[in-house]
């Protein structure tokens, strides 16, 4: 109880298909258990990256994975690995660095620790989430070269070297398309170019759109066509079922 959400086999229909239910939890600086259960607080991402110590990072998140196992949590909503583009970004402390190489190395070391215990980490926010002000509507206009060499390089390393199997998209847009339904990012780069074969999710209650169209949180078709697997998060009160299914 008190975790961020559950996904997968959350209904009788899905469990009947053999799909297990998984539990995810914030966050990059230690587990957040809103039920009141105490958890250890970890150093933030910037401090950890300042050590340049991969083995220490792996050891720390091996411990984290064991704590997740104790609390029946399958998937950590971290590491956060956006680039320090501006010193006033409200979540810079959560992210590793302005350097994409260091970001990818530290994320890979963190994932190694989690994976050693059977836990998974979710690399986020994919991508261009480099400020907090109006981040639900932010449009990060980025050239192809800057995107691949700076803003995506750490994610690429986390996928190829770190073996990441869970990715979270952002609240905002990249070049006019909200990342929750951005085919070029989620399929073209992540899956096709990098060979990612894992699980993707949106950030919580994210906007979705098609190029040139207004955002719509219920445009799940655009999300599905982009191969973004799960919209986070919904409750039964948000679902409208056909009469025949009631």
Where are the model-predicted features located?
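Glycoside hydrolase catalytic-domain context in secreted enzymes
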Residues: 1-244
């Amino acid at each position: 109880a008190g975790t961020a959400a559950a996904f997968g086999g959350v209904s009788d229909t899905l469990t009947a298909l053999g799909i297990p239910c998984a539990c995810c939890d914030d966050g990059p600086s230690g587990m957040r258990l809103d039920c009141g259960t105490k958890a250890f607080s970890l150093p933030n991402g910037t401090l950890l990256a300042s050590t340049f110590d991969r083995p220490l990072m792996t050891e720390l998140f091996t411990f984290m994975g064991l704590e997740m196992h104790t609390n029946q949590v399958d998937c950590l909503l971290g590491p956060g690995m956006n680039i320090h583009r501006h010193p006033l970004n409200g979540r810079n402390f959560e992210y590793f660095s302005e350097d994409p190489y260091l970001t990818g190395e530290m994320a890979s070391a963190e994932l190694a620790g989690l994976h050693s215990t059977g836990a998974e980490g979710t690399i986020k926010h994919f991508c261009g989430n480099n400020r907090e002000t109006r981040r639900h509507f932010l449009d990060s206009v980025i050239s192809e070269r800057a995107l691949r060499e700076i803003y995506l390089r750490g994610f690429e390393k986390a996928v190829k070297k770190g073996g990441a199997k869970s990715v979270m998209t952002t609240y905002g847009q990249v070049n006019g398309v909200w990342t929750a339904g951005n085919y070029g990012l989620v399929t073209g780069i992540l899956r096709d170019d990098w060979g990612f074969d894992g699980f993707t999710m949106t950030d919580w209650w994210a906007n979705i759109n098609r190029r040139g169209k207004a955002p719509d949180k219920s445009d799940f078709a655009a999300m599905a066509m982009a191969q973004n697997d799960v919209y986070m998060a919904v409750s039964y009160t948000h679902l409208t079922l056909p009469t025949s299914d009631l």
